[in-house]
UniProtKB/Swiss-Prot annotation:
Native source organism of the sequence: Methanobrevibacter smithii (strain ATCC 35061 / DSM 861 / OCM 144 / PS)
Residue sites binding Zn(2+) per the record: 591, 595, 695, 699
Protein name: Alanine--tRNA ligase
GO cellular component, one term: cytoplasm
Cofactor(s) the protein requires to work: Zn(2+)
Catalytic activity: tRNA(Ala) + L-alanine + ATP = L-alanyl-tRNA(Ala) + AMP + diphosphate
Gene: alaS
């Protein structure tokens, strides 16, 4: 037992319900946490006075500042700004992992205090139902980084501060329980105490001592971290005694939503429901209906009475919570999409629309978001700065959602049809999740489309399962490669213009089945940051060897040699190296141009622009930018123009090495536009007044050295990501000349001047379109005539009217004639072919009911033609190169009826 517990009068006890060890000042049978204890503060606040969320944030900050902690500003909730293993900040400690907790970087203050908005979607299905779960919550923390040289405080002082804070806000300390437990998250773990009062956990005090390894094992770390997490929303809630935390923390939003939806509230049922339902999570019960029934039984009312009161309010709570979460997500730079953090934002957004639909709200999501922003921006001015951006995304995403639902009907119907064909009567969960994952079709829409014809069971924790599959980033996992050589001296950082060098060969390293050379120093830039490596030659004892690739492994540059060369003879010798300078300067121009284009795009499109990837090339390069819609040609022109203005300003680049904490302190997380840069020291490329990034690539000395920048095209590479293809320097001149050449050649074909080309092309297209329509009309008339001429060729086979004919018609005509026969009841089965090896089959509903599978018939008939075929039960087509076998193919088709 810790000395501090004894000093403060806490006694070690064991919960008679759950068996957990806990500490309290008075004798108790239970540990103070749900489900062992009900919420005992609803209608009976636990503090001397009520606090709003923002008041409790201020009190928390002031209390810890008096106790010697330095308050710091919140971090973005998008953790990918500084780490590559998770997408979102799930706890305040995520802000300091891995760089601070590993000792590589100094903390911004020590000890520090922060109120950090955090997002957790692993229990999203509990939101609105338990009264306490939120997708986005504010974690108050006092954090300490203890080292051997500077050990500040550990368990005793952490517990004392917690005890004193709750006492300070008016909680009776005899109601506080410290439950002994274990915590892990973000790659670290350690023992902890969960601090509970009147049935709700208010804080977790974690003492991080271990790193969590990939294999699940733990490894002790030299730095000991005090990581506390106070649920500030819950503390505000317990101080007010409202039925739910939502009523306590965003009452103005909840009240406005109640007004818009005209939801009537039975406060007695709602309060008692919150007390009981709060003790149970969906994952604990497994079935929401069972949970509802238990609550209804406890209240002495019917299930219908409970649902009538609870469900509309739960939907309102969910909408209020989700719009708050979205405000932080979008303001901090997340672009909704179908991948990574964008997927999580879209999940929250579409759940919001779903519950608005349940309440039959006439308002748009943008209007509802406006209500949330009016409340939230009073306390977070940085969100106010992003208000227009947020509203643009919300409006666009709402349109996309409606489009998805329309398209979803046919996708779901096809999926159900396939399952029925396989003899299944219920949709598997993995298919239901895939319909949401791949197509954005929510489960309730699938249920609605399936109707009574097919069983679709949606688990109550569906969205929790979906979110859980997307919360961690596994795309950056790399295989480890051990190498035991001293760090290579990178000469290109000391003198960009150095083209030749002399070095000593330290050894030969085999990697990926190839032998590579290690030097003590090099001018060869190794591939990295989307920039290809330098190439060139080395001379050893008069022999010249080509270097076709260089890569860096653990700060050692490996030089790949072209051809089959005995490298062991080189070890210990001096070599003279020379790089391909034209390639180097071209790549450097493209790399510097990349920075200018990103800066220009941010200026033109908005501060949300973030580099999502890049690849530099010799003739053209590309950069991927996170953006919520297509970049228009007008915007592209503006970006290109601004980037070239930066070039003409001929600004000198400022390139320096900083410690990570110095760089972040000076420039923030926008440093990491090009990705997370590992290491304690980082190289910062600054174009004064325009852009600053952590970047290891080669760059020109002044922007004027880049030369012209030509944007070639843009494309949508994935949802939420726009790719800009561009060229710089002489490569840009080549691109411009090539476009001019194509323009002149096109003008020559039409025999018009260049400026007349668009008008001429438009006229030719209009004429072609009109002629095509006329041709299609004539083909339709011909098909009608041919159909009439074939009316007498109907024969009867097994009670079905059948037409078989080899005629002179193209594929589309064959299809039209065949379907016209079956649609107008002139025939049940139509089999037609032409002399080009095309075969078509059509079947009426009467034929299908009789067991005719025209798609299988055509597939077999097309085999005779040396090809294949298939299609639907109503219409199938096939083709093959053996045109001379068409009569045989049609006869085989007839035999299969």
């Amino acid at each position: 037992m810790l000395e501090i517990f004894d000093k403060l009068g806490y006694k070690k006890q064991k919960c008679k319900t759950c068996g957990h060890e806990f500490y309290a000042q008075v004798d108790r049978d239970t540990c103070g946490d749900a489900p062992c204890d009900e919420y005992e503060f609803i209608g009976n606040p636990a503090t001397d006075k009520p606090y709003t969320l923002y008041e409790i944030q201020q009190v928390f900050r002031e209390f810890l500042e008096k106790e010697g902690h330095t308050p710091i500003k919140r971090y973005p909730i998008l953790a990918k700004r500084w780490r590559d293993d998770v997408f979102l900040v799930g706890a305040s400690i995520f802000c300091f992992q891995p760089w601070v907790t590993s000792g590589m970087v100094k903390p911004p203050a020590n000890p520090l205090e922060i109120e950090q908005p955090s997002v957790r979607l692993n229990d999203v299905d509990n939101v609105g139902r338990t009264g306490r779960h939120m997708t986005c919550f504010t974690m108050g923390s006092h954090t300490v980084i203890n080292t051997e040289e500077n050990f500040i405080y550990w368990e005793d002082e952490t517990i004392r501060l917690c005890h004193e804070f709750f006492k300070y806000i008016g909680i009776n300390t005899e109601e506080i329980c410290f439950i002994k437990s274990w915590w892990s998250g973000g790659g670290n773990e350690g023992p902890c105490y969960e601090v509970c009062v009147r049935g709700v956990e208010l804080a977790t005090l974690v003492f991080i001592q271990y790193k969590t390894l990939d294999n699940g094992e733990k490894e002790e770390i030299p730095i000991k971290v005090v990581d506390t997490g106070y649920g500030l929303e819950r503390i505000a809630w317990i101080s007010q005694g409202t039925p739910t935390a939502y009523d306590a923390c965003f009452a103005p939003v909840v009240d406005k939503l109640k007004e818009l939806t005209d939801v009537k509230v039975n406060t007695d049922i709602l309060a008692r429901n919150a007390q009981i339902a709060g003790m149970m999570d969906i994952e604990d019960i497994g079935d929401i209906k069972e949970l509802r029934q238990q609550v209804a039984n406890s209240l002495g009312i019917t299930l219908d009475e409970l649902l009538e009161s609870a469900e509309p309010m739960e939907a309102i709570y969910i909408i209020a919570d989700h719009t708050r979460c979205l405000a932080f997500m979008l303001a901090d730079g997340i672009i909704p999409s179908n991948v990574k953090e964008g997927y999580l934002a879209r999940l929250v957004l579409r759940r919001t629309i779903r519950f608005m639909k349940e309440l039959n709200m006439k308002e748009s999501l943008a209007e509802v978001m406006g209500i949330q922003l009016e409340f939230l921006t009073k306390f977070y001015p940085e969100i106010k700065d992003s208000e227009d951006h947020i509203m643009n995304i919300i409006s666009l995403e709402e349109e996309r959602y409606q489009s998805t639902i329309k398209k979803g009907t046919s996708i779901v119907k096809r999926s159900i049809k396939r399952l029925k064909k396989e003899g299944k009567t219920e949709m598997p969960l993995d298919m239901l999740m895939d319909l949401y994952d791949a197509h954005g079709i929510p489960p309730e829409t699938v249920v609605e489309i399936a109707g009574d014809n097919f069983t679709v069971n949606v688990p109550d924790n569906f969205f929790t399962l979906v979110a859980g599959a997307h919360e961690k980033d596994t795309s950056n996992k790399k295989e480890s490669f051990e190498i035991d050589y001293p760090e290579t001296d990178l000469l290109f950082y000391k003198d960009f213009n150095q083209k030749e060098f002399e070095a000593e060969v330290l050894g030969v390293v085999e990697k990926d089945g190839k032998n590579t050379l290690v030097f003590d120093k090099t001018v060869f830039y190794p591939e990295g940051g989307g920039q290809p490596s330098d190439v060139g030659t080395i001379s050893v004892d008069g022999a010249v060897v080509n270097i076709n690739y260089a890569e860096k492994v653990n700060n050692v540059v490996l030089h790949h040699v072209d051809g089959d060369v005995d490298l062991d003879n080189f070890v210990g010798k001096k070599v003279e190296g020379k790089i391909d300078w034209n390639r180097r300067i071209t790549l450097a121009r493209h790399h510097s141009a990349t920075h200018l284009i990103v800066a220009a795009a941010r200026k033109i499109l908005g501060e949300h622009i973030w580099q999502a990837g890049a690849q530099k090339g010799v003739s053209r390069s590309r950069i991927d930018l996170s953006h919520y819609k297509r970049i228009s040609q007008e915007e592209l022109n503006e970006i290109e123009k601004l980037a070239n203005e930066y070039v003409m300003d001929n600004i000198e680049l400022d390139i320096k090495f900083y410690t990570r904490d110095e760089a972040e302190s000076l420039y923030g997380f926008k440093l990491y536009q090009g990705g997370i840069v590992p290491g304690k020291s980082i190289r910062v490329v600054k174009i004064p007044g325009i852009d600053v990034q952590a970047c290891a690539g080669t760059h020109v000395l002044r922007t004027g050295d880049i030369g012209p920048i030509k944007i070639n095209k843009t494309e949508r590479v994935q949802d939420g990501v726009e790719r800009i293809d561009f060229s710089a320097g002489t490569a840009a001149v080549d691109s411009i000349q090539n476009e001019n050449k194509l323009l002149r050649e096109s003008s020559g074909i039409f025999k018009v001047d260049d400026d007349q080309l668009p008008k001429t092309c438009d006229r030719f297209f209009s004429e072609w379109k009109a002629q095509k329509n006329e041709i299609d009309k004539l083909k339709s008339e011909i098909a009608s005539l041919k159909m009439n001429s074939l009316a007498d060729d109907v024969t009867e086979i097994n009670g079905l009217k059948v037409v078989k004919q080899l005629i002179d018609a193209d594929f589309k005509e064959l299809q039209k004639i065949a379907t016209d026969f079956t649609d107008n009841d002139k025939a049940d089965v139509v089999l037609m072919g032409n002399n080009d090896g095309k075969i078509v089959g059509a079947a009426s509903q009467n034929a299908i009911d009789a067991g005719i599978k025209v798609n299988e018939i055509i597939k077999k008939a097309a085999g005779v033609l040396g090809g294949g075929g298939g299609g639907r039960l109503t219409l199938a087509q096939g083709a093959g190169p053996k045109c001379e076998n068409m009569n045989e193919a049609l006869n085989i088709a007839i035999d299969l009826i």
